[in-house]
Amino acid sequence: MRSNHLFFRKVMTRLEVHPLNNSRLFCISDSSSTSLYSEPSKGSTIFAQQALDRFDWDLSIGETAFENMTDDAKMRNDPGMLVGPDGMLITPELLIASPGKIDVFDCASLDDTAGALEGMSLASGEGSNCMQAMRPRSETRSTNTTTSRSVAKQILRNTYGPVRYKDYANYLGSPENREVLREFIALLQPLPVSLLFSLRKLSKSIYFIAEAGAIDAMLEEMSIQWVERHKPLHYQDNYKLVHIVLFSLLILNSDLYNDMAQMKFTSAQFVDNTVYALLRESPTIDKQSFEAELRVYYDLLAMDQLPLHKPPITASHSRDSANPTKKSSVFYSRGHRMERTYSNSSTYSMSTISLQRTTTAIAAKQTAAVASWRFHNFSDLPLIYCKEPFDDEMNNTNDSSWLMDHIIQFQEPLGSVSRAAAASMVSPTAQPRRKLFNWLKKGQPDSIFKSHHEFGSAEGKWYNARVRISEGRLYIFNFKNQPALDPKTADLELCRRRAASYTVQNLFGAMATFVQDNIVYKSNSQTTWNFAITFPKTIDCETERTYQFQTSNMTMAQRFVQAATFWSARITPLPSAQFEMVSNQEYGWGEKLLSRQVAATDVRLTDWMPLIGIDSIYDEIEDSGDLTVDSQLQNLRVFTEHLTQLLDQHNSYKPKMVEIWTQNPSTQQFEMAMENWNRRYLYLNSMYEKHYTYLRALETAFETVTG
């Protein structure tokens, strides 16, 4: 027993009590000073503190201060009796008679003196929150609870023999071990008010390299127990909001301390995009409270990364680390919410929920990463097109412009790295970068976060995949070398659980292309046909990403291209603003110059650049859902005609420019003028080709439903 004082905290409304010889049991009221016996109050909590605790409690901002117990408040020598802070005896009869005054009292095993409390669960009849509704408690505790608690303790001590310590997180995250996970998180109590401190506590308590499903399950359980304990108003008693913040912090940590990522997320980017995800979950949140809290989290995390759990050096651990051939789990998605299902190597990185902010509404709102995150977390994916009467039937017609769903070959996305150094984007007080776990080393096979630049090259390996194009989105379930699940027998939920990895991409601004030349598949000399889908760099990624696919027949490849192009054309808004710089600067074809009102020797040329990128000029994504297919068709016809006129006009400049600039003695000026002309021509032509392709695909699809 601690001599004069026993530290305690007012903690969550659920606690398993362990009758150890060195533990003491107290009842603490809301004010931490009033006896529950004399003044029972809603929110009172039963709290057990072990004298020989192996962890020091984390201090965090806003955490309830530690209080000193008086000698009178200590446990009496009678084992199992509960005593209030002023020494009043709390009997089982009192607890039974006042269930409405106690949120939850969950006692798995007390000794004989308090045997009447064995297995009792008392929950408040008032103000029950979403966790209580979601996770109802049975009247009697299962005998498995004691076993689960024992296993959880062994995992916390790194002594659970049946599983390697590096696989503890995977073990806890599996659905069949959910009760063990609950007990494990309960052993980390009290969880700090600060979610970052709570995440640190978890990170240093277990080897946190695991499949995404396992990590997600652990964060979910921590979120549930955190909300049961803490009641900040801006979290609305909603564990999903906590889950989003925890997940965002974890991914931010990987971004800040990933040596391969030169451009780090700024505080504003992290805050804005996390708040956006929170608003998607609950539109009524207090934005200012979350923004202030997230800014503090960013600053703290920028100074010190999440700790890596290092278990005691033992012979068994040494053997584990010396055997790199053993299966190392990867961050895979788990069936739970928008991007949390059971897949095995989810391709979402920092952009999954804390999205890269760019000037485009696409990147800021409905990016491909948001689609993946929502799909992973079982959130309903928003409708991103204007639904019409013919859509109900066509959305269920495979091998059509509306739906393509087949097993084909898939190669992980290609993308070049063009990240600029971004030291200025990181807090100047940040300490030197340290590697984040083993996750983020280049080429590390068990990396849980895949960066875009790690994707395969044109000579990369092909994998079995189920690929689906439907309602404006591309779904890829990568089964690696295992047989992919047939769409006829497996739904999307089963694919999420079985796939090695998966991704969901919105087709905003995407471009699908068919490879005309057939390819001989090297392994079996089988003729195959390729197609690719490229996403603009402003959508979820700083560089263009190209997904490559391979089919066994030409027709299927062409149909995939048509479906992808149709949906891109249908949902991608057309540029509605000026997309070229309007200024008095001269690029080599100014009206006064071409009419010879100004001599070439008297002008100073400037490099021509588009005002913004081709795919950064769309209106808000939500607006695209207001247009019918027919309206989008008309707009595309008008826009492509406008681009045709611009191209014709630009081509007419060329002869005059050559005549004028060849007379200029400056070769450098001539080359600069020609380069400007060529750059603008390529820009306009690329816009024309893309939108003309959209127009043809939309016309082809529309004809099938209008005759």
UniProtKB/Swiss-Prot annotation:
Gene: YEL1
Subcellular location per the Swiss-Prot or TrEMBL entry: Cytoplasm; Cell membrane; Bud neck; Bud tip
Domain of life from the UniProt record: Eukaryota
Function: Guanine nucleotide exchange factor for ARF3 required for localization of ARF3 to the bud neck and tip and involved in actin patch polarization.
Any single GO CC term annotated in Swiss-Prot or TrEMBL for this entry: plasma membrane
Domain SEC7: 110-304
Membrane topology field: Peripheral membrane protein
Keyword Membrane: yes
Keyword set includes Cell membrane: yes
UniProt-recorded name of the protein: Guanine-nucleotide exchange factor YEL1
Species in which this protein is naturally found: Eremothecium gossypii (strain ATCC 10895 / CBS 109.51 / FGSC 9923 / NRRL Y-1056)
Keyword tags: Cell membrane, Cytoplasm, Guanine-nucleotide releasing factor, Membrane
Residues of the PH domain: 447-571
Region (Disordered): 127-148
Pfam families per UniProt: PH_GEF_YEL1 (PF23633), Sec7 (PF01369)
